[in-house]
From Swiss-Prot:
SMART domains: HTH_MERR (SM00422). It comes from Bacillus subtilis (strain 168). Residues 8-27 bind DNA. Activates transcription of the bmr gene in response to structurally dissimilar drugs. Binds rhodamine as an inducer. One of its GO terms (molecular function) is DNA-binding transcription factor activity. This is Multidrug-efflux transporter 1 regulator. GO terms for biological process: regulation of DNA-templated transcription.
């Protein structure tokens, strides 16, 4: 049977593969023309070659790397079956990853929405909170006046490796006391929220996975400024004292960037909350 020859443009139309892709496949020895005119360098393909593009297109569609495509071209049916089984496993692994990532983004949005729906800033309110998973470490002499972004670097690095998603908030805990000055305050722990429910086993001895418990909290949120920090804490303390509420936890302080623009002055939202008996 006489073979029909097609130019690269004709193969592009017949197989629905771009000319650019066909040239690249030739370059990497994935799909080479049957004949190249030595005078014009035009590529020509035989009719029987077109079937090989079916496998290449199918493997490209499922995201198979080019080097793996080359290997697949040499496989017999039983071997190709095993190859597809492995591709299926890899796809399921990717789907599991994407599903977990979707849940993480959903949780981030849920927390952001809650923060955007707070009552008026600078006013104490009571809120029923869900449990929040955190990773924390002892503060070791850190307090409101000397805490730095760098103080959280170790926690953030661990969260990035465990969650794969950089957290946009961090916090601290301190005991509930009738403070009269910010100089009296020292943090017990610094922490950052954990965004996934994955089992985390490789923490260092100075770190601890724990939770901010589910329950009812007296809260105050405000845009940070040095002069407003202690005034807002005093509002929270006074609110609890005036209503004779029973405190059952430390104060949780959460700091959230309002924006990330390098062209603007840094701005932060501070949330202070303490669990109260229901």
């Amino acid at each position: 049977m006489k073979e029909s020859y097609y130019s690269i443009g004709e193969v592009s139309k017949l197989a629905n593969v771009s000319i650019k892709a066909l040239r690249y496949y030739d370059k990497i020895d994935l799909f080479k023309p049957a004949y190249v005119d030595p005078d014009t360098s035009y590529r020509y393909y035989t009719d029987s070659q077109l079937i090989h593009l079916d496998l290449i297109k199918s493997l490209k569609y499922i995201g198979t790397p080019l080097e793996e495509m080359k290997k697949a071209q040499d496989l017999e049916m039983e071997e190709l079956f095993a190859f597809y089984t492995e591709q299926e496993r890899q796809i399921r692994e990717k789907l599991d990853f994407l599903s977990a990532l979707e849940q993480t983004i959903s949780l981030v949005k849920k927390r952001m929405k809650r923060q955007m729906e707070y009552p008026a800033l600078g006013e104490v309110f009571v809120l029923d909170e869900e449990e929040i998973r955190i990773i924390q470490t002892e503060a070791e002499g850190i307090g409101p006046e000397n805490v730095l972004n760098a103080s959280y670097s170790k926690l953030k690095k661990f969260i990035e490796s465990a969650d794969g998603f950089t957290n946009n908030s961090y916090g601290a805990t301190f005991s509930f006391q009738p403070y009269t000055s910010i100089d009296e305050m020292t943090y017990r722990h610094i922490f950052t929220p954990v965004l996934t429910n994955k089992q985390i086993s490789s923490i260092t001895p100075d770190m601890e996975i724990t939770t901010i418990p589910k329950g009812r909290y007296a809260c105050i949120a405000y845009n940070f400024s040095p002069e407003h920090y202690f005034l807002n804490l005093q509002k929270l303390i006074k609110y609890i004292a005036d209503r004779q509420l029973t405190v059952v936890s430390d104060v949780y302080e959460l700091i959230i960037p309002i924006h990330y623009s390098p062209k603007k002055q840094e701005e932060y939202r501070v949330e202070m909350k303490i669990r109260i008996a229901e």
